[in-house]
Amino acid sequence: MSLPSLADFPAILLPFITRARQTWRTALTELSAEALASFEAWPEARRTAFDRVCAASDFVTEQICRDPQMLLQLAGSGELERSFSVGELRGQIADALSSAVTEDELGRNLRRQRARQQVRIIWRDLTRQADLIETCRDLSEMADASIDLAYQWLYPRHCQQFGTPTGRHCGLPQQMVILGMGKLGAVELNLSSDIDLIFAYPEGGETVGTKRALDNQEFFIRLGQRLIKALDPVTVDGFVFRVDMRLRPYGSSGALVLSFNALEQYYQDQGRDWERYAMIKARVVGGDLAAGAELLEMLRPFVYRRYLDFSAIEALRTMKQLIQQEVKRKGMAENIKLGAGGIREVEFIAQAFQLIHGGRDLSLQQRPLFNVLKTLEGQGYLPSAVTEELREGYEFLRYTEHAIQAIADRQTQMLPDNEQDQARIALIMGFADWASFHERLMYWRSRVSWHFRQVIADPDSDPDDELQDDSEVVVGGEWLPLWEESQDEDAAGRQLLQAGFVDTGKALKSLADLRSSPNLRSMQRLSRERLDAFIPRLLAQAVEHEKPDLVLERVLPLVEAVARRSAYLVLLTENPDALRQLLTLCAASPWIAEQIARFPLLLDELLNEGRLFNPPLAPELAAELRERLVRIPEDDLEQQMEALRHFKLAHSLRVAASEISGSLPLMKVSDYLTWLAEAILDQVLALAWRYSVARHGTPSRPDGTLCDPGFVIVGYGKVGGIELGHGSDLDLVFIHDGDLQTETDGAKPIDSAQFFTRLGQRVIHLLTTQTNSGQLYDVDMRLRPSGASGLLVSSLGAFARYQANEAWTWEHQALVRARVLTGSRDVGEQFEKVRADVLGRERDLDTLRAEVSEMRAKMRDNLGTRLTAAGRAANAFEASVPFDLKQDAGGIVDIEFMVQYAALAWSREHPALLQHTDNIRILEGLEEAGLLPDVDASLLREAYKAYRSAAHRQALQKQAGVVGGDQFHAQRREVMRIWAQMGLS
């Protein structure tokens, strides 16, 4: 929003200006001739500003005529025309209070400072020399300084009178913590805000140093009363801030001050939804800042739930309905804060997202509205066009609020009904007349109201109705009698049959089993109400699917799993599109249904269809994970592990959904799953490295330089070959280049070999530990030198020697698919050189063919389909027998072995074959080098992709990689033919 331009003064306001000039001149004349001369010397711009401010604000006119020296000083110091630096406003108030000896003087000096600062702030706001953010910041800083400096003045005097409060357990002096709530907490005070405060103290105990000890709570209650008295009462000097303490536990009937433990217990046991909403903006504004930070950290779990909390929308909707009823009852439709499309609706939109997602997305845990809107846009919660409209609408409403309040320094947001005040507001807002201003105001209110309804409104409600009655139609209401068993079984069966169910008896039994399950019987009333609202919607959408029986069979276990965490049911009730996606994905894949049932937090991914079916590329994946982890304290391992697991679960779901929908082909599916593993491994290694170095210090290389980390994670098998599937484990090998003869440089040094072994163990621990969100990956380390009996971590030299002198041919075959996934670049480059040297050495081809064939035969005998002699018997192509996509003849492993044989046989003459580790590109390399006929190379590539695609589909159906023997006839025969042509048996 561009700042409103200055407009010509309307005739109706000229009397205000004339009267202000006359009264001001009289006051200056009475003060001194020099004072009048000083005013006469003002530049034209300041004199115009004087007229504008006095035309708009009776309060400023009254203050400056009462104390003309105040405005002259503000003008002479240049403070009217410049922004304050950080701390400058507090410094002025501190100077003013330094001379106060009595509490009366404290109150008087605070009020005079408030009047001075208020005149300056209103002047700069009405003349648009300060933007909205600066005005709110100055007002909030004035409040912060007034509260804290008054407290700092009162506390030592209170201690002198009653003793110093001391913690019962810590034995240390206690200070009060003052929390600023609402607009004060968010640094968004308006021109005539009251201040919402909560007082607290760290722990119980009693005062020391006086004859009669006071309980700590009694001490702080009395101190709080003195602080309120210093700020709130209206005297001949005015007031500082109206103090509202009703946001404390139990409101006006509760104790004025509570201990940290009492506060935590209250919010844990009795905290209400509106109190979560209020706590979003809580900020320590005075007293013990360090203790205050600890208190806010204690209360964070109450405000921000670790799971998605769509119940917050219900709470905000209820609050809004109560506000609407009050607005209607009191005739406050013209209230720009509480009325439709007002300031509160913009705040509700932002806070709805904060309460729902803030427990998992730490970037939303902030107070200022503009910052939250920016984050909502940046994180993809709202489109930029929406956040821009909300920003502009909010600015317009807040400027209007300030114009209203500047008139008389009154806390009101009602549009005036008299022509003079209407003209004042139109002038300040830059409009020629009230009608033009009001038209623009109503435009912004309509836009805000529309966006509010999109986010907050009940999905069953009529968007044109501000207040709903009990006659509204409930989505899925026709299924409510069936769920509540208010119709007989025959009628219920007929309803299901007519809707498309096949086995109506099974469907009714499934619903009955759900109703009688232990999870549901022990549900609280609110959770049961949410379930009863959700099931009819579920049935209404299930019958839209081709196979509603299958949908119900797969989704009801999820419903039972989340029933007691009913916020998830609210999520699906509030988001019909998310429910639709859930049913579609569960119908397509029992694997997805099981994943979501085990980890309901995945429901969040269904909210954004564009994101669900568009998984990010490798750099974006890595950046997103880094951004998530950087918001978590380095010492909070539990949260880091949960964040890693949620990241993996979410992106695995997105890849599976994209594969099912057909938006991702097979090769891209494997690419994404492999990139996901690489991003996770990169961060896991970083976490393990930081932990290990913190405990033992850093190991050294043979040249004396420090390792950083001097360690690589090498991927074999599917992850090495960029062919990960759903649920694949990771074949890993760890290699380092540390000096085995030295120790680490920390306070608790250990030798380098032990350090790297522990580092490897830490990596495995982070990957495999089961948490509430499962594990990241199963890890297989058996491909390391000497297998399970070998060292967990090998030095680069030991690895090279083993591969050169001891490794079996099958280990060299495995090395064909090995590549560095993460770690030190220089160690990775040395590994690649070792790999190239080992794979590219001269080999006897007859011996190589025999060894490759022998290993393949062993695998077929042990792992293939025995009924068909691993696909080689005469019955192997019959529909009644199974075909193992991976292990049977003509399948995946045959193609992999041919590729590995070719790489070992010909890479000495054709080193380009070693550039890639995936089978498809190695086959392309064999074709380009003329080592494999074009037709055969193409056949192998297409067969390989077809097999893997079928295996992926089987995995998503939670089935083994086995299909009927009548499938893939042509591919199997061609693979077997090429196998034989290569001389393999």
From Swiss-Prot:
Gene3D superfamilies: 1.20.120.1510, Beta Polymerase, domain 2, Nucleotidyltransferases domain 2. The keyword Ion transport does not apply. One of its GO terms (molecular function) is [glutamine synthetase]-adenylyl-L-tyrosine phosphorylase activity. CDD domains: NT_GlnE_GlnD_like. It catalyses: [glutamine synthetase]-O(4)-(5'-adenylyl)-L-tyrosine + phosphate = [glutamine synthetase]-L-tyrosine + ADP; [glutamine synthetase]-L-tyrosine + ATP = [glutamine synthetase]-O(4)-(5'-adenylyl)-L-tyrosine + diphosphate. Belongs to the GlnE family. GO terms for biological process: regulation of glutamine family amino acid metabolic process. Its EC number is 2.7.7.89, 2.7.7.42. Signal peptide: none annotated. It is an enzyme of class 2 (transferase). Coiled coil: none annotated. HAMAP family: GlnE (MF_00802). Residues 1-460 are annotated as: Adenylyl removase. Involved in the regulation of glutamine synthetase GlnA, a key enzyme in the process to assimilate ammonia. When cellular nitrogen levels are high, the C-terminal adenylyl transferase (AT) inactivates GlnA by covalent transfer of an adenylyl group from ATP to specific tyrosine residue of GlnA, thus reducing its activity. Conversely, when nitrogen levels are low, the N-terminal adenylyl removase (AR) activates GlnA by removing the adenylyl group by phosphorolysis, increasing its activity. Keywords: ATP-binding, Magnesium, Multifunctional enzyme, Nucleotide-binding, Nucleotidyltransferase, Transferase. The gene is glnE. NCBIfam families: PRK11072.1. One of its GO terms (cellular component) is cytosol. This is Bifunctional glutamine synthetase adenylyltransferase/adenylyl-removing enzyme. Residues 476-985 are annotated as: Adenylyl transferase.
